């Protein structure tokens, strides 16, 4: 029996939880390209992803899901097209404590527009325990105003259960049957 390999992309702004989410769910120790932050990113976290993160989930003996996390910094956007090749879907993580998370939605949905027009997207909002507004309904309405439909969840990127829920929602949206 041949191996089935699937690829899911995690994206979002610096500090939204991409590296943490992949580490929470991966069956292997994630491969990261974190470096010490040297720009305005330093105010959000001491290290930042400069190329990608990689993790792996073994669903069965012959089925794997490869997890790729993008850098949240725009200057590394040349990697984004490379990482989406062969991907089945996008998980957009948003930090609810950022100044304008709707600007983050605009930016990332525009940057990945070609990909999400062909594939599915799921949105996970982190740090809602620290900042309740905007709420999940606000995110859904904003996505609809951009002519986008995607499930939106309140998630803790450190939680295996929450990240599993995002992946299951993405896989279900691909094949609800």
Regions found by a protein language model. Name each.
Residues 2, 49, 58-60, 82-86, ...:
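Conserved catalytic network of the ASCE P-loop NTPase/AAA+ motor domain
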Residues 89-93, 116-127, 146-155:
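Conserved beta-strand/loop subsegment of P-loop NTPase cores
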């Amino acid at each position: 029996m041949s191996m089935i390999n699937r690829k899911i992309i995690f994206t979002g702004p610096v500090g939204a939880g991409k590296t943490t989410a992949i580490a929470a769910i991966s069956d292997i120790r994630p491969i990261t390209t974190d470096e010490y932050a040297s720009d305005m990113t330093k105010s959000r976290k001491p290290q930042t992803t400069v190329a990608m993160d990689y993790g792996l989930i073994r669903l069965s003996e012959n089925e794997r899901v490869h997890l790729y996390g993008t850098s949240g910094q725009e200057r590394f956007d040349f990697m984004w097209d490379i990482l989406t090749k062969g991907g089945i879907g996008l998980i957009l993580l948003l930090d609810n404590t950022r100044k304008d998370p709707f600007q983050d939605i605009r930016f990332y949905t525009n940057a990945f527009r070609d990909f999400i027009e062909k594939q599915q997207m799921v949105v996970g909002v982190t740090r809602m325990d620290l900042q309740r507004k905007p709420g999940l309904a606000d995110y859904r309405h904003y996505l609809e105003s951009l002519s986008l439909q995607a499930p939106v969840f309140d998630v803790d990127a450190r939680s295996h259960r929450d990240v599993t829920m995002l992946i299951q929602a993405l896989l279900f949206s691909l094949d609800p049957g």
